[in-house]
Design a protein with these regions (language model features):
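Non-catalytic helical/linker scaffolds that mediate oligomerization, partner binding
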Residues: 1-381
């Protein structure tokens, strides 16, 4: 049976300098999100890189999320170049757009208004927290953005080093409570392999995972060379080993509604059974994100008919997205479809218990209103 173990996602930078083989090796090593830095490269080169990532991901039958990182500037935070880059990124159907030098929620709104004007309001905005003003205005920024990227090395200038770990912990905790995905950039030396990483490197990565980050990102990587493949392998190994030894905190629901109540119930069920996995049906990704916010010990299989949601969910902690080629309407069809998908991918065995979370009826539901404990048919050999 194929194992589904790692829950923390890995982000790495891919550039036009990256070869096809290196991109393939990086995806195989465990890269979930490819960050494309728009400070470098022509549009033709960047388009080719994006096409290569998509092609290889398709061949490997694995989702890879595309994160466009704008060059950004301090004044204004969204420059004329950034506007052109956003338009190009939208033409390439990027999944997330990261904006730097954010000082207030207004900076996020400027980008969101641009996306609205371009008919791309569903494209997620990542707020890079790297300025003291952003830290001071953190809550209002979180109310506007769709995800957060933090890099202690960036906002560490002028701040006492002993405060940085607690600041990172506070930001991650607030994001977890609000249900906002958070990426933690970690410094990894260019010569890093798992055997030669320093204790400080490993400790920083482990702490970010224990704090509850959704993803860890290889910082200061302008190109994906062989060393980035080794860096991804290191992050995957540290994440897998850390997750096996800790119990994540369950975050209290940010809202009091049916969907939030069901997501809270997941943890109680998981601790008693536990199930093999949680299967969620989602058209927007909302249900899967709520389930992930509870930090269950078992993987979340997010089934969606929407290719954009399929890719974007690959950033979310603990979520394994699956793209559906057909939609179902009845409860019986839904259950049968879950079994078929999980069996085909060798994620379950006969007799395994799973949790199904969805909105019934599937095509007309106004939200998640259904949770079922289901036993996979058949007998164990």
């Amino acid at each position: 049976m194929q194992q589904l173990t790692r829950q923390t996602k890995v982000v790495a930078t891919v550039s036009p300098a990256s070869s096809l083989q290196t991109i393939a090796d990086t995806i195989k090593a465990g890269m979930n999100v490819a960050c494309i830095n728009f400070s470098h490269g022509s549009y033709d080169d960047l388009a080719q890189t994006i096409a290569q990532i998509r092609s290889i991901a398709g061949e490997l039958d694995t989702p890879v999320t595309l994160l466009q990182e704008l060059q950004s500037s301090e004044l204004p935070s969204l420059s004329n170049k950034d506007v052109r880059d956003v338009e190009f990124g939208l033409s390439q159907e990027v999944d997330y757009i990261a904006l730097g030098f954010i000082k207030s929620a207004e900076d996020v709104r400027v980008l969101k208004n641009l996306l609205q004007q371009k008919g791309a309001a569903d494209t997620a905005v990542v707020a890079k927290i790297e300025k003291h003003d952003a830290i001071a205005n953190l809550e209002e920024i979180l109310d506007e953005c769709d995800a957060v990227m933090i890099a202690p090395s960036d906002f560490g200038v002028g701040m006492s080093q002993e405060k940085l770990p607690l600041l990172q912990q506070r930001i991650i905790a607030l994001c977890n409570h609000k249900g906002i995905p958070v990426i933690s950039a970690v410094q990894v030396p260019e010569s890093t392999t798992h055997k030669h990483s320093t204790r400080a490197d490993t400790s920083d990565i482990t702490k970010a995972i224990m704090d509850g980050t959704d993803a860890i990102m290889l910082a200061s990587q302008s190109e994906v060379k062989e060393i980035s493949v080794k860096g991804v392998q290191m992050l995957v190994q540290i994440a897998t080993e850390t997750e096996a030894e800790i119990e994540f905190l369950n975050n209290p629901p940010a809202k009091t509604d049916v969907t939030h109540a069901l997501s809270v119930g997941l943890n109680a069920i998981c601790k008693v059974l536990p199930p093999r996995c949680i299967a969620t049906f989602t058209s927007s990704g909302y249900t899967a994100r709520l389930a992930a916010g509870e930090r269950p010990k078992v993987p979340i299989i997010a089934l969606t008919p929407n290719p954009k949601v399929y890719r974007s969910l690959n950033l979310i902690w603990g979520v394994q997205p699956v793209l559906l080629n057909r939609e179902v309407e009845t409860f019986e069809e839904l259950t049968a479809q879950v079994e078929e998908i999980l069996r085909d991918r060798s994620w379950v065995e006969p007799g395994d218990k799973i949790i199904i979370m969805a909105g019934i009826p599937t095509k007309h539901s106004q939200g998640t209103n259904f949770l079922k404990i289901h036993t996979i048919a058949g007998n164990r050999e």
